[in-house]
Every structure is written in C-alpha cells, then in structure tokens.
Amino acid sequence: MEEKGSRMVQQGNQEAAAAPDTMAQPYASAQFAPPQNGIPAEYTAPHPHPAPEYTGQTTVPEHTLNLYPPAQTHSEQSPADTNAQTVSGTATQTDDAAPTDGQPQTQPSENTENKSQPKRLHVSNIPFRFRDPDLRQMFGQFGKILDVEIIFNERGSKGFGFVTFENSADADRAREKLHGTVVEGRKIEVNNATARVMTNKKTVNPYTNGWKLNPVVGAVYSPEFYAGTVLLCQANQEGSSMYSAPSSLVYTSAMPGFPYPAATAAAAYRGAHLRGRGRTVYNTFRAAAPPPPIPAYGGVVYQDGFYGADIYGGYAAYRYAQPTPATAAAYSDRNQFVFVAADEISCNTSAVTDEFMLPTPTTTHLLQPPPTALVP
C-alpha cells in the first residue's frame, strides 16, 4: 500500500510538473504591420509576459486565452489606431495649410479686380491743335477708352486733358509707352489722375448793400447816388435763395437842350409788380418839367443784362421798352441825368420790336436814332 501511495504521489508530481512545462512557454512577440506612407510606428514592442509562479492544472478558459493571446489582439488594433492617428495628423496639417494656400489665391483675385476697374490718366503738354478725337486715337491703341476730355478756355486748348480707360492695366501700359514721347515737337507727359478735393469756398457777393459794383471804377451806384427815380426790374428768381439784388437798372441819359417827354406825376409809378424791390428816390433839387420833346430825337432806354442776367441767370430774353408820356415821369438834376419812374415798364413788357434789338455778348440795347453821347 505504501508503494502504491508513493507511486501515486510520484504520478501526481509528474502530472503537476508537466503542466508548468506547458505554461512556462513565453508568449510570442507580436508581429506588427509594416509602417505605412513612410511614417515610422510610434509604438514599441510589448514586453513578454512573465512565467507564472504557480503550478497546477489550468482550466479550459485559460487555454482559450492562450489560443487568442491579448498581444495578438493588441497587434491587430495598434496599426489601426496608428493609421487613424496618422490620418488625423495629416488632416490637421492640411487644415492648417489651407489658409496659407488660400491667402495667395485671395491676393491675385484682388489684383484682378483692381486691374478691371476704370482708371483716369492726366495728359499734359499736348499740342494745342489737338481735339478729343486726336487724343482718343493716340490712346485707343492700348485698350478701350471710356472718356476723353481736353480742357479749353476762351482762347482755346489749355494743352492738357484726361483719358479714362475701362481697364486699369491698359491705362498703366499706355502711361508707360506714351510718357515722354514727342508729338509735334512737344514732349507728352502722362500721369495718373488724382482725385480733386472740393473745398467749400465762400461765395463773394459782388453787391455792396444790394447794389452792383461798377466793374470799371469800382464805385457803388445806388438810387441815392443818382437824384431821381429808378426802375428796378423783378428778377426771374424772385423768392429763391439767389434773389438778393436787383436784376437790372433802367434809365435814360439826357443832354442839356435835348429834352425828354414830359409825363404825369410820379404817382403813376406803382411798384406792385416789383414785389417791394423797387423804390422811388427824390432828390433835393427842383423837379422841373422839361421842355416839349423833339419828335425827331428820342431817348435811349438801356438795360444792362450784366446786372441780373449774367450773374443770376436773369431772363432768357431781355425785354425793353421806351417810356411813354402816359406811364413815365421824368426828374432831372443839375447834371441833366433823367431817371424814368415807370408803371408798366418792366422786364416783363412785350412792347419790343425785333428790328431795334441789337444782341451783344453781355447786353442787348433797344436803340432809336442815336444821340450825341456826352459825358456829364
């Protein structure tokens, strides 16, 4: 019995010793997939599992773990994780690089928009005989032209102008080619036109106390200066902000011995149609009635359009009439200046015949047989 027991112990020991031989085998190192896209793997090989310190029979679930070691599972998942990290890293770099690539693309688009905008050139020292078609022909070879303008004054061309191109690139090319070229003995200068700064200049009132300054002597002529009656025609812009002065002055000039028609009293002067702008001024001298008129020699009714028409726009057509005995009263002073106080004589009168109209650049006169003009 003892021998059988010792044999059973030995057999048990032998069976127990066989099990550790099977469990003592270390796990094989995991076989990782080769690196992809030339990027080295960021992981290291796992350490082998240490041998178990116990001895004994293993259960079936443990053998299933040996058939599917966790290292193998780790080796299969690690490359996927690495690939995911690699892809995400690449995507991040692409996103970061996207704005960098987009910035150069934005700048050319802005340059393209600037080149497609119109541009104006200032052309100076051009021949004085040049007109707009000549300047257009000179610059038209470089691109489409929107506008050509040569500056003129009353004497002719001022020798410079402006050319507007539809495309700024064409304008730059024309400036480079034509700047400094000699045309008819004159060196053309082409530069970029600069924007003109408009300043609010204070308008100088040419009137002193509402009356026009004489452009020759600079004296102020008003009704008080002439001892008599003045007829002031109503301005066309009455009631507007521009209506600040009389538009015309109607008067007659006389010489001693050349009387003018007598008329009714000064009460015939009714200023209702003058809207308060006209006024009658009486001098301190005796208002004597002149001698009977000379039928063959009449007066001259003169209206200077410069007083109203040229400054404030005035009337489109000047209206003039000669006073008649029924509508005018003559007052004379020691200098024999006669001023007509009229009722219906105004800028609106239509009693004018075209045969007496003599147009001039600034004035229009209603002339009768010309008198001998003497300066008093």
Curated annotation (Swiss-Prot):
The record marks 120, 128-129, 153, 158, 162, 186, 196 as: Interaction with RNA. GO terms for molecular function: mRNA binding. Residues 72-89, 102-115 have a biased composition (Polar residues). It is found in: Nucleus; Cytoplasm. It comes from the Eukaryota. Disulfide bonds: none annotated. GO terms for cellular component: cytoplasm; nucleus. Transmembrane segments: none annotated. GO terms for biological process: mRNA processing; nervous system development; regulation of alternative mRNA splicing, via spliceosome; RNA splicing. The modification Asymmetric dimethylarginine is found at residue 319. Residues 90-101 have a biased composition (Low complexity). PROSITE patterns: RRM (PS50102). Residues 119-195 form the RRM domain. Keywords: Cytoplasm, Methylation, mRNA processing, mRNA splicing, Nucleus, RNA-binding. Residues 1-126 are annotated as: Disordered. RNA-binding protein that regulates alternative splicing events by binding to 5'-UGCAUGU-3' elements. Prevents binding of U2AF2 to the 3'-splice site. Regulates alternative splicing of tissue-specific exons and of differentially spliced exons during erythropoiesis. Binds to the C-terminus of ATXN2. This is RNA binding protein fox-1 homolog 1. The gene is RBFOX1.
